[in-house]
């Protein structure tokens, strides 16, 4: 009896027959046409009796009157005898009643495959064995981290991952996966719930209809598709965007707070007017900062309060909640201050919309450097001809011209981070590193 553990080599062959044949026809052709061809030492039946030839495995299927398949023959004879057996298979020219061809695809050395598996497993075991212990300096952080992450739970019949305050809160943040919920918990945000895939669970659909909802997905095509499906099946109030190309699970605490603070009402997303909304918010902030009266001398300055819409519960009710035994008083103060207007915040979006106002309806293209300064300005019609001469290190491009797929691909080769234009048509491949900003 042949033992599988004694296999040294496997002969892989492909067979093609001009007609419909079965597995039994292929096996019969092998034994019938090889019999007496190689001498008594390599007689197939004798090799099987001695345990040197394994079971001949045949997988065959028929299509349009022809049969195609694969043959695997395990052997435990030496290399030369295995090569002779493989070559003899190519002499078979009939299978059953049909003309056929058999070709050797490869001869696999099973021992090499086993050695490779041994090496890979040994590497994994070595990494586990040599895993370093916890740094004493990070013990406190590790304990705090575990307390936050342990609070993640599952809710509903779909068992979707969620923060501990999702059911009690009047506002929720919908993210992509469990890792995103954990990252928001690290930032002190406890009202996040994950969709876990492109199919929106019924639990989340019902929650979105009852609560103020902010969608917060990855800045890639996958996140865009999930957002589109979420908007089709339920009610969403706001959309928050991370930096284009970045995942929510990789964001720092400051980046998460900034993205949620700059959330956009869903009406502007549906009408593709995100840029217009951000520009209007900027002008309102500037106006309010000019009109705000100075407090009287000797009086205590008023505590900052955000506007009263229900959407504030997404941030103010959940993010500023003190985490027992996990967040110190100093961290709570820092967390509150994160929601105040940040005068030193990155001013790139403001610079972008300034350039948009200056380029709009002028038929020009403006190339923006990393610091927001204008590097060059050309007529929009000449941009495609002079793309090759553009200097590297550009932050973005603002152009008063319709953008198609060909022009977008050329711009992406220069490493820009954003592209502002009146419209984008025929875009089927969106580069992950570029954020498109439409304006009218």
UniProtKB/Swiss-Prot annotation:
Its cofactor is Mg(2+). It is an enzyme of class 2 (transferase). PROSITE patterns: TOPRIM. Binds two Mg(2+) per subunit. One of its GO terms (cellular component) is cytoplasm. One of its GO terms (biological process) is DNA replication, synthesis of primer. Mg(2+) 1 binds at residues 176, 218. The keyword Transferase applies. This is DNA primase DnaG. The gene is dnaG.
């Amino acid at each position: 009896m042949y033992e599988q553990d004694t296999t040294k080599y496997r002969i892989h062959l492909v067979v093609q027959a001009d007609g419909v044949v079965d597995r039994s026809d292929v096996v019969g052709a092998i034994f019938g046409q090889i019999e007496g061809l190689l001498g008594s030492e390599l007689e197939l039946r004798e090799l099987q009796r001695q345990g040197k030839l394994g079971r001949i495995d045949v997988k065959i299927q028929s299509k349009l009157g022809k049969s195609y398949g694969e043959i695997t023959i395990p052997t435990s004879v030496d290399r030369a005898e295995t090569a002779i057996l493989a070559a003899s298979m190519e002499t078979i020219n009939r299978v059953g009643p049909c003309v056929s061809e058999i070709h050797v695809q490869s001869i696999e050395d099973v021992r090499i495959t086993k050695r490779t598996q041994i090496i890979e497993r040994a590497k994994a075991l070595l990494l586990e064995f040599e895993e370093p212990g916890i740094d004493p300096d990070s013990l406190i952080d590790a304990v705090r981290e575990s307390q936050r992450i342990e609070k993640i739970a599952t809710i509903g019949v779909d068992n979707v991952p969620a923060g501990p305050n999702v059911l009690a809160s009047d506002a929720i943040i919908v993210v992509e996966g469990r890792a995103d919920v954990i990252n928001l918990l690290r930032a002190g945000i406890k009202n996040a719930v994950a969709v876990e895939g492109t199919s929106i669970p019924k639990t989340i659909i019902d929650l979105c209809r009852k609560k103020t909802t902010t969608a917060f997905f990855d800045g890639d095509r996958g996140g865009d598709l999930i957002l589109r499906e979420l908007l089709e099946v339920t009610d969403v109030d706001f959309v928050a965007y991370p930096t284009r190309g970045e995942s929510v699970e990789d964001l720092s605490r400051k980046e998460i707070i900034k993205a949620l603070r700059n959330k956009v009402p869903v009406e502007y997303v549906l009408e593709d007017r995100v840029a217009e909304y951000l520009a209007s918010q900027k002008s309102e902030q500037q106006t309010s900062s000019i009109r705000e009266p100075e407090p009287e001398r000797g009086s205590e300055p008023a505590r900052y309060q955000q506007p009263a819409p229900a959407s504030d519960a997404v941030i103010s009710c959940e993010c500023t909640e003190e985490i027992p035994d996990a967040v110190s008083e100093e961290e709570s103060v820092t967390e509150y201050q994160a929601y105040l207007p940040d005068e030193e915040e990155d001013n790139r979006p403001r610079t972008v919309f300034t350039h948009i106002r200056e380029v709009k309806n002028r038929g020009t293209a403006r190339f923006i450097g990393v610091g927001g300064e204008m590097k060059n300005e050309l007529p929009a019609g000449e941009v495609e001809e002079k793309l090759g001469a553009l200097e590297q290190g550009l932050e973005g491009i603002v152009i008063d011209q319709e953008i198609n797929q060909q022009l977008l691909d050329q711009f992406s080769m220069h490493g820009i981070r954003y592209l502002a234009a009146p419209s984008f048509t025929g875009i089927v491949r969106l580069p992950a590193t570029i954020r498109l900003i439409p304006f009218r």
